[in-house]
A protein has these predicted regions:
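Canonical positions in the second alpha-helix
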Residues: 29-30, 74-75, 107-108, 143, ...
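Short coil turns that delineate tetratricopeptide repeat
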Residues: 35, 79-80, 113, 148, ...
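TPR alpha-solenoid repeat register
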Residues: 1, 39-40, 84-85, 118, ...
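TPR-repeat structural position
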Residues: 20, 65, 98, 132-133, ...
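Register position in tetratricopeptide repeats
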Residues: 11, 50-51, 94, 128-129, ...
Length: 264
């Protein structure tokens, strides 16, 4: 009850800092009476971490990531549960200690708490550590393997993440497959940007008809976007439709005479 009330006070504290004092009093009371002190330390850490993530204009007393970490490590000293290690990774990640965060996520991934989210966290951290793309992709594969199969809408963003990594590493055909799987997962509820990204993958994979279909869709959904219209001209050029390409470029220049891309 104390922890729940402390959470309520912290939410109220955004407008009135005196509520933070009440939250601290509840923390202290919870630590006195709780049988599972590790659970209280963990909840204090989680609360302070969440508070810092919200980027407060002025930090209340010592409610920093370091304080969150100190409380969390007191919880871990009592019982090193994987859920505590996951939060340790998240706090270290927020502090930009990516090596420390990765070590924590790797422990979670070797535990019974391993999930799509924990493998994704490890993949993003490795990426920030400039690790080999093969290692990052292996973690993304593990992430997607832990999603429901076929992937559902809630887990679909992981497919977009992997597609982007494939594109950055010249694996356009694989990226296209992930974009297709994403499209299926969200029942075709996609926007112009999705069609533009998938078109880029199709173009790199030399699937020109597919690239053309997708860029047409992007232009349909956002007819004023000059990037899409210029790309439409480029794809027409690639498939040898020179007149169509020139027509599109002339239309762009008519609407926006200063648009430099159209002169390429």
């Amino acid at each position: 009850g104390y922890i729940r009330r402390a959470n309520y006070y912290v939410a109220k504290g955004k407008d009135d800092q005196s509520y933070f004092d009440k939250a601290v009093a509840d923390f202290n009371q919870a630590l006195k009476v709780a049988a599972k002190k590790d659970d209280v330390y963990y909840n204090i850490a989680k609360l302070i971490y969440g508070y810092q993530l919200s980027k407060p204009e002025t930090t209340y007393k010592d409610w920093t990531y370091d304080t969150a970490l100190k409380n969390l490590r007191q919880a871990m000293a009592i019982d090193p549960l994987p859920v505590y290690t996951q939060l340790e990774g998240d706090i270290l990640f927020a502090q930009q200690d990516y090596a420390g965060a990765l070590a924590a996520y790797e422990k979670v991934n070797a535990s019974n708490l391993a999930s799509a989210a924990s493998f994704f966290s490890a993949a993003k951290t490795k990426e920030l550590l400039k690790a080999d793309a093969k290692e990052v992709l292996a973690l993304m594969d593990s992430c997607i393997a832990r999603c429901p199969q076929p992937v559902t809408a809630n887990f679909a963003p992981y497919l977009l993440e992997r597609a982007q990594i494939y594109m950055n590493n010249d694996q356009a055909r694989n990226a296209m497959l992930d974009y297709d799987a994403y499209y299926k997962a969200v029942n075709g509820q996609v926007n112009d940007l999705f069609y533009y990204y998938r078109e880029q993958a199709a173009l790199k994979a030399r699937q020109y008809q597919r690239a053309l279909d997708d860029i047409v869709k992007a232009v349909e959904l956002s007819p004023k976007d000059l990037t899409y219209r210029a790309e439409h001209a480029v794809v027409n050029l690639r498939v040898g439709r020179y007149e169509e390409s020139m027509k599109i470029l002339n239309e762009i220049l008519k609407d926006e005479p200063k648009y430099g891309e159209a002169y390429r």
